[in-house]
């Protein structure tokens, strides 16, 4: 009984391999089918994916502002061995005073 089931599975696998080789060997018909497949993937997978991502961003933006964590002056963070070459030398290039603390703490506190 196990041998019969094994031969059925092998027959199905062999048949699917034959169908796959036929699809891969088709020349001119493959280009039209490929274009149709990519068009369908664009409309039914990519565009709904973009829509779901937009909805996620919209819902997250209306969720509310989170409180920032309390500043803890760890000795291994925000080490300044020499000043930055711009501004006052203490702010990074893309410094945000509401999010990025200086070595002494947040600026707007």
Curated annotation (Swiss-Prot):
One of its GO terms (cellular component) is mitochondrial inner membrane. It is a single-pass membrane protein. GO terms for biological process: mitochondrial electron transport, cytochrome c to oxygen. Residues 60-109 are mitochondrial intermembrane. The keyword Mitochondrion applies. Residues 25-34 are mitochondrial matrix. One of its GO terms (molecular function) is oxidoreductase activity. The chain crosses the membrane at residues 35-59. Disulfide bonds: none annotated. Pathway: Energy metabolism; oxidative phosphorylation. Keywords: Membrane, Mitochondrion, Mitochondrion inner membrane, Oxidoreductase, Transit peptide, Transmembrane, Transmembrane helix. It is found in: Mitochondrion inner membrane. Its main location: mitochondrion. Residues 1-24 form a transit peptide. Component of the cytochrome c oxidase (complex IV, CIV), a multisubunit enzyme composed of 14 subunits. The complex is composed of a catalytic core of 3 subunits MT-CO1, MT-CO2 and MT-CO3, encoded in the mitochondrial DNA, and 11 supernumerary subunits COX4I1 (or COX4I2), COX5A, COX5B, COX6A2 (or COX6A1), COX6B1 (or COX6B2), COX6C, COX7A1 (or COX7A2), COX7B, COX7C, COX8B and NDUFA4, which are encoded in the nuclear genome. Component of the cytochrome c oxidase, the last enzyme in the mitochondrial electron transport chain which drives oxidative phosphorylation. The respiratory chain contains 3 multisubunit complexes succinate dehydrogenase (complex II, CII), ubiquinol-cytochrome c oxidoreductase (cytochrome b-c1 complex, complex III, CIII) and cytochrome c oxidase (complex IV, CIV), that cooperate to transfer electrons derived from NADH and succinate to molecular oxygen, creating an electrochemical gradient over the inner membrane that drives transmembrane transport and the ATP synthase. Belongs to the cytochrome c oxidase subunit 6A family. PANTHER family: CYTOCHROME C OXIDASE POLYPEPTIDE VIA, CYTOCHROME C OXIDASE SUBUNIT 6A1, MITOCHONDRIAL. This is Cytochrome c oxidase subunit 6A1, mitochondrial. It comes from Bos taurus.
């Amino acid at each position: 009984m196990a041998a019969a089931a094994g031969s059925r599975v092998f027959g199905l696998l062999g048949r699917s391999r034959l169908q796959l080789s036929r699809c891969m060997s088709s020349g001119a018909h493959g280009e039209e089918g490929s274009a149709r497949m990519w068009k369908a993937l664009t409309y039914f997978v990519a565009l709904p994916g973009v829509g779901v991502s937009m909805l996620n961003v919209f819902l997250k933006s209306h969720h509310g502002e989170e409180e920032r964590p309390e500043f803890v002056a760890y000795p291994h963070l925000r080490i300044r061995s020499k000043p930055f070459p711009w501004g006052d030398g203490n702010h990074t290039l893309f410094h945000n005073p509401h999010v990025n603390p200086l070595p002494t703490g947040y600026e707007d506190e």
